[in-house]
Amino acid sequence: SIKDRNVLQIQTLKRNNWNVTRVFAVNYYNNPKREIKRIKDLLDRITGRDKKTGSGIAKAQKAYKCANVSQLFETADYVTSGDNDAEIVSRLKAIVGAEEPISENFLIRRTLSTLGILKFGNKVENRMLALIPLCGFKREKLLGEFYYRKTDKPVTFDKYRVETGEKAVRRYETDFTPYEIIALIKAALEDKVALYTEEIASVACAALRLQKVTDKFAAYINDCVTLGEERGLFVRSVSDRISLA
């Protein structure tokens, strides 16, 4: 069937460590030089002779834009008293507007940090969880975590963000959204064609300017790869090599 020929056969080859590319007869007939060059470029990437290695990673990168909010130095009572809800909601909206998409956990920590509250307990967290729905954000649940955004525009897996300042605001694995991690993986695979999951973790760690690949970060990368497989973006071979679908 058409599905066997165009989908299942190709996925089977990729799962068995084949590097697969399509050459359509009509494209070759109309422009054979272009198609031959495309195949040569693919072979150069596979053999490591491509001088443009890393271009996909660079192209998919953009700067992380932090919200412009004033820094306060308050205590936990500022949040739990209920007297400052309007100010807290305003900060939540400003942060999501500038830094979307953003995980629920990071949104809470990020907002509290602008209030000078770096350590907090369940009472403060529950109050923040009660205020977030008042903002009217759009949200999507991925890998067990809610990710918020201000706009209705669907989030794509095309760009990942890198912080340019000396002090990074993102510290934990879910601070880097699955949208960004999948975009980074796609870019890496455009450069390298196929990679093992541990190689992807190393590439991601370097691209995001993290000090080292922790066990939690490696597990998170693997979860994002699995999500990419479910979305039809990646194919995992029997030897655990990942390639673009």
Residue ranges of predicted features:
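C-terminal non-catalytic scaffold/interaction domains in large multidomain proteins
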Residues: 53-245
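Non-catalytic C-terminal interaction segments of nucleic acid-processing enzymes
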Residues: 37-59
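Basic, amphipathic alpha-helical patches used to engage nucleic acids or provide basic targeting signals
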Residues: 1-42
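Basic, low-complexity terminal or inter-domain segments flanking catalytic cores
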Residues: 27, 32, 46, 210-215
